Amino acid sequence: QGLEKVYAGRGVLCEFELDPDARFQGEVGDLLEVLGNLLENAFKWARSRVLLSTRVEARAGSSGRRLCIAVEDDGPGIADAQIERVLQRGVRGDEQVQGHGIGLAIVQDIVRNYAGEMMVDRSPELGGARFTLRFPLSR
């Protein structure tokens, strides 16, 4: 809600598709840091829409499950050739856009600390960037 207020002048709307069974098994501060960074980036680049979704999914080749969190926007997206670069500490996707270039690197560090994975691609629904995080669930 805070980000919607900050970006209200641009008319960006945040939508939610949340699985009621999806629970993050970790420190609340880590989850807030991850979501804050991903949503801030999405709002920065979005034309009009941001989507946050969560779900629980089966882990491939295992009996375990994992939490999947995705943040998508309808902005210009990130070219495949630029994905690795924008995940580096201190690198920004566009020098004209405000930021320090450390947010995505922090997200990646936190995800790795939980033995999770982060994937960056194009949102099939919105057309912009999609950041998908997967965290193993212990139960």
Where do the model's predicted regions map?
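Short conserved segment of the HATPase_c
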Residues: I78-G90
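Short beta-strand/loop element within the Bergerat-fold HATPase_c
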Residues: R49-G64
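Glycine-rich ATP-binding loops of the HATPase_c
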Residues: A115-R122
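Conserved polar catalytic motif of the HATPase_c/GHKL fold
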Residues: G36-N37, N41
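Acidic ATP/Mg2+-coordinating residue in the GHKL
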Residues: D73
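Conserved catalytic submotifs in the C-terminal HATPase_c
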Residues: L13-R23, E57
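Short alpha-helical Gxxx[C/S/T] motif in the catalytic ATP-binding
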Residues: G103, V107
